[in-house]
Amino acid sequence: MSNIPAELKYASSHEWIRKEEDGSYTVGISEHAQELLGDMVFVELPEVGDDVNAGEDCAVAESVKAASDIYAPLSGEVVAVNEALEDSPELVNSDAFGDGWFFRVMPTDLAELDNLLDAEGYQAVIDDE
């Protein structure tokens, strides 16, 4: 069974978010998602300064099995990207909730947080797959 940290929020499309001290949110994919995808070989990230919209694809995770779009859980401006993934995409596999994060977004509509799932709700999504 996948690890689902209780302090994070989740999208049903398997992205997670974590609030940072500056008000931005770090975005990554869940341990469950990386297990389904398998070994990462390439990650395409948005650019700092890009505007992203909740529910729209803004990054790509490519593994030995498939390429998968990564969707923005929140609308806002991309304020940081994880450049370490450029040379080490396998960080997504080894530390999905830590060093394997994708990007940070400064949200423009905090009400969108209400559309995200807690750990229990996300577990229910996985169980229904």
UniProtKB/Swiss-Prot annotation:
InterPro entries: 2-oxoA_DH_lipoyl-BS (IPR003016), Biotin_lipoyl (IPR000089), GCV_H (IPR002930), GCV_H/Fam206 (IPR033753), GCV_H_sub (IPR017453), Single_hybrid_motif (IPR011053). Binds 1 lipoyl cofactor covalently. The modification N6-lipoyllysine is found at K65. One of its GO terms (biological process) is glycine decarboxylation via glycine cleavage system. Keywords: Lipoyl. Coiled coil: none annotated. Gene3D superfamilies: 2.40.50.100. One of its GO terms (cellular component) is glycine cleavage complex. It comes from the Bacteria. Its cofactor is (R)-lipoate. Residues 24-106 form the Lipoyl-binding domain. The glycine cleavage system is composed of four proteins: P, T, L and H. The glycine cleavage system catalyzes the degradation of glycine. The H protein shuttles the methylamine group of glycine from the P protein to the T protein. Belongs to the GcvH family. PANTHER family: GLYCINE CLEAVAGE SYSTEM H PROTEIN (PTHR11715), GLYCINE CLEAVAGE SYSTEM H PROTEIN-RELATED (PTHR11715:SF3). This is Glycine cleavage system H protein. The lineage of its organism: Bacteria, Pseudomonadati, Pseudomonadota, Gammaproteobacteria, Alteromonadales.
